[in-house]
């Protein structure tokens, strides 16, 4: 049962009493195991006792400068109180959870330090380099970011323009951004906060370009924080969201760094300029793969946050009547509201479970690479490319539905859903634009189909082995039947897109033109393949659950998920599934909406997202929305005076003049 406290809204209390499972046990399933869920609660509790972390006013009422100053103030407070928390500075998950609790989703100076800068040092710096920089980074003696994207180049790494030219005479790399479009653009915390960056630049030796490589670059003096000679750096301005972060630009004019600042775990440049290539051509992409490998979980938590708000508020908000004309109905009792929210709730769980799988696959990949085995690189790169695209897009859709489900109050910043949306939707373009990501996965699918056509299906990776299977009609009486249906649709679309691409080349089109003319069909194949993987990940997680009440409700949520997902792509089932089967799937969806309804509030409570982190008046744990909405509105800076200076200066004279 969810926690119930004296003074809670009676409707939310009623919902929580209806729970058939223990939310702490559900949290253990969500976050992997009981120790992790318990640790998150301990961290949240310890942080709540540090009163200096309280905000003087809601973040949404702060200017951008105030937000950045507030995040810096809180980081300094945290640095003085670490010993009051069970925080482990070497644990990335600890850091991410604490920052979400304390700093919310507005961004902060350490956002990329812990998620990109340190992990890249771990994955790509040599032992000697780690001894030099990693400890300092973890102790926060230096603050770093990851600078790859340029003003004119994002997803296409091979077209990056920043150069690092090696000088054998001085054993230095000379960094330059030769054009305006070569400026590094967008990296978080680059503008004003970071004094170091891992910069991705083309490595040039004796006029030969060896492609993009990561370099450790000091940007600012460690005492004065003034940019070093040959470096121009600054903030790129306000954004759709995430305005507590100083996303920046960075340019170089013959800036010199030592040869040993090239990250050398997998590749080296000798003093005489000899280049030693990595064991795999795309080993340098591991930092991107790392970020993408956890994006499913991060986006799932963004979606979860929006659903905590929308589901709780829908249980508190009453509107209209059904059979009982004496009492208004909870909005959550309307089937349309359930249909709007519950499929997204299922997706949030599915994305988090999928994220844990891909994080595990990435960890295994790092171990394999250290042993000289890079065979899993292509598989994981393809998978995370597809997941990144599908999950970010569906998360954006789900958050927007959650906002609209809150009615007019969802449009207010008091709901905080618009901020969650703005942060989450950025994932559709950072770390690779979504359409490009789908096409990267499509290349992998096309190669797989070509292997089958040439009789080499034994070379297929496990994630695409279904492409060689024979189709069959699904038995929808079991979950495996839904997997069979999805496999059939994904397989047929992958073959259809590949055949179109190959046929265009046979008619004389170049590979590039044929690819472009097949691109829409190829992206459809990638989406279906990815959605199949998500369903299977959800099923695998549910199959391992031991607690019976938790397993029962998640099995219901899984049934809701597969029925909704199959209906969502029903056009691909033409000539494969009958209208009777589709009607059955639709009826099953409505059945599972009803089954999930009594557990909805406890399912969102199980994410255990605190009020401090949620920052939402509508999604408060206690459900006391309306009195706090009025309190929130009164705290608006416009209400400091009854008459605004602009009224005295402009509107009153205008009205007086109109009376003459």
UniProtKB/Swiss-Prot annotation:
Compartment annotation:
Peroxisome
Keyword list, A-Z:
ATP-binding, FAD, Fatty acid metabolism, Flavoprotein, Lipid metabolism, Nucleotide-binding, Oxidoreductase, Peroxisome
Q: Which reaction does it catalyse?
A: asc-C7-CoA + O2 = asc-DeltaC7-CoA + H2O2
Q: Which cofactor does it need?
A: FAD
Question: Which Gene Ontology terms of cellular component type are present?
Answer: peroxisome
Residues the record marks as active site: 431
Instruction: Give the GO terms filed under biological process for this record.
Output: ascaroside biosynthetic process; fatty acid beta-oxidation using acyl-CoA oxidase; pheromone biosynthetic process
Q: What happens when the gene is disrupted?
A: RNAi-mediated knockdown abolishes production of dauer pheromone daumone 2, severely reduces production of daumone 3 and increases production of daumone 1.
| Lineage top rank: taxon | Eukaryota
* UniProt key word Lipid metabolism: yes
| Residue numbers covered by motif Microbody targeting signal | 658-660
Q: Which InterPro entries match?
A: ACOX_C_alpha1, Acyl-CoA_ox_N, Acyl-CoA_Oxase/DH_mid-dom_sf, Acyl-CoA_oxidase, Acyl-CoA_oxidase_C, AcylCo_DH-like_C, AcylCoA_DH/ox_N_sf, AcylCoA_DH/oxidase_NM_dom_sf
Provide the induction entry: Induced by high temperatures (25 degrees Celsius). Induced by starvation.
Task: Report the EC number(s), separated by commas if there are several.
Answer: 1.3.3.-
Pfam families recorded for this chain? ACOX, ACOX_C_alpha1, Acyl-CoA_ox_N
Residues the entry annotates as binding ATP: 339, 389, 393, 401, 524-527, 572
Binding sites annotated in the UniProt record for substrate: 282-285, 292, 430-431
Residues binding FAD are: 146-149, 154-155, 188, 317, 337-340, 433
Identify the pathway: Lipid metabolism; peroxisomal fatty acid beta-oxidation
Regulation of activity is described as:
Activated by ATP. ATP binding leads to a conformational change that promotes FAD cofactor binding and enzyme activity. ATP binding likely occurs during acox-1.3 folding and/or dimer formation.
| EC category | oxidoreductase
The record's function comment reads: Involved in the first step of peroxisomal beta-oxidation by catalyzing the desaturation of fatty acid-derived side chains of ascaroside pheromones, which regulates development and behavior. Specifically, shortens ascarosides with a 7-carbon side chain (asc-C7). Does not catalyze the desaturation of fatty acids or hydroxylated fatty acids. Involved in the biosynthesis of asc-C6-MK (daumone 2) and asc-delta-C9 (daumone 3) but not asc-C7 (daumone 1); daumones are pheromones produced during unfavourable growth conditions which promote entry into the dauer stage.
| Family per record | Belongs to the acyl-CoA oxidase family.
* Entry protein name: Acyl-coenzyme A oxidase acox-1.3
């Amino acid at each position: 049962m969810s926690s119930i406290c004296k003074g809670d809204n009676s409707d939310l209390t009623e919902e929580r009493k209806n729970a058939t499972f223990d939310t702490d046990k559900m949290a253990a399933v969500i976050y992997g195991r009981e120790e992790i869920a318990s640790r998150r609660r301990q961290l949240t509790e310890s942080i709540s006792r540090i009163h200096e972390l309280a905000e003087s006013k809601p973040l949404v009422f702060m200017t951008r400068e105030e937000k950045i100053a507030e995040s810096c103030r809180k980081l300094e407070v945290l640095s003085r109180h670490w010993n009051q928390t069970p925080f482990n500075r070497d644990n990335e998950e600890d850091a991410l959870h604490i920052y979400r609790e304390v700093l919310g989703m507005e961004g902060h100076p350490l956002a990329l330090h812990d998620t990109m800068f340190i992990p890249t040092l771990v994955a790509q710096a040599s032992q000697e380099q780690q001894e030099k920089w990693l400890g300092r980074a973890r102790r926060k003696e230096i603050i770093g970011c990851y600078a790859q994207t340029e003003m004119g180049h994002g997803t296409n790494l091979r077209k990056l323009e920043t150069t690092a030219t090696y000088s054998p005479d001085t054993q230095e790399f000379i960094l330059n951004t030769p054009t305006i479009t070569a400026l590094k653009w967008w990296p978080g915390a680059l503008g004003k906060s970071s004094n170091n960056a891992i910069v991705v630049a083309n490595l040039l030796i004796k006029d030969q370009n060896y492609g993009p490589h990561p370099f450790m670059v000091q940007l600012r003096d460690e005492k004065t924080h003034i940019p070093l000679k040959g470096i121009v750096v600054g903030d790129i301005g306000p954004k759709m969201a995430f305005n507590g972060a100083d996303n920046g630009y960075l340019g170089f004019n013959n800036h010199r760094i030592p040869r040993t600042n090239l990250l050398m775990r997998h590749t080296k440049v000798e003093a005489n300029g000899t280049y030693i290539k990595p064991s795999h051509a795309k080993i340098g992409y591991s930092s991107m793969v790392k970020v993408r490998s956890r994006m499913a979980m991060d986006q799932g938590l963004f979606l979860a946050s929006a659903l905590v708000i929308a589901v709780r508020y829908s249980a508190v908000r009453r509107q209209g009547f059904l059979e009982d004309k004496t009492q208004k109905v909870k909005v959550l009792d309307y089937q349309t509201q359930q249909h709007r929210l519950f499929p997204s709730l299922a997706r949030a769980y599915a994305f988090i479970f999928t994220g844990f799988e891909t994080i595990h696959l990435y960890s295994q990949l790092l171990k394999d690479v250290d042993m000289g085995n890079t065979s899993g690189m292509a598989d994981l790169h393809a998978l995370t490319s597809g997941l990144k695209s599908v999950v970010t897009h569906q998360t954006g859709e789900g958050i927007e539905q959650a906002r609209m489900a809150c009615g007019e109050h969802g449009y207010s910043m008091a709901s905080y859903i618009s901020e969650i949306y703005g942060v989450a939707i950025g994932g559709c373009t950072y770390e690779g634009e979504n359409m490009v990501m789908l096409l990267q996965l499509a290349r992998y699918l096309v190669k797989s189909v070509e292997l089958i056509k040439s009789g080499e299906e034994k070379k297929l990776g496990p994630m695409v082995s279904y492409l060689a299977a024979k189709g069959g009609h699904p038995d929808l009486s079991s979950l495996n039947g839904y997997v069979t249906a999805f496999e059939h649709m994904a397989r047929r679309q992958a073959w259809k897109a590949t055949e179109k691409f190959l046929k265009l080349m046979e008619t004389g089109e170049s590979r590039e033109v044929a690819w472009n003319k097949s691109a829409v069909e190829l992206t459809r194949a990638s989406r279906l393949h990815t959605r199949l993987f998500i369903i299977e990940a959800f099923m695998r997680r549910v199959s391992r659950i031991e607690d019976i009440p938790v397993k029962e409700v998640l099995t219901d949520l899984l049934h809701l998920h597969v029925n909704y997902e199959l209906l969502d792509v029903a056009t691909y089932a033409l000539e494969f599934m009958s209208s009777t089967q589709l009607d059955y799937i639709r009826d099953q969806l409505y059945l599972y909406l009803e089954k999930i309804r009594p557990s909805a509030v406890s399912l969102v409570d199980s994410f255990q997202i605190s009020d401090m982190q949620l920052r939402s008046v509508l999604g408060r744990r206690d459900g006391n929305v309306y009195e706090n909405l009025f309190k929130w509105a009164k705290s608006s800076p416009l209400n400091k005076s009854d008459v605004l200076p602009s009224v005295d200066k402009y509107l009153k004279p205008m009205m007086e003049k109109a009376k003459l």
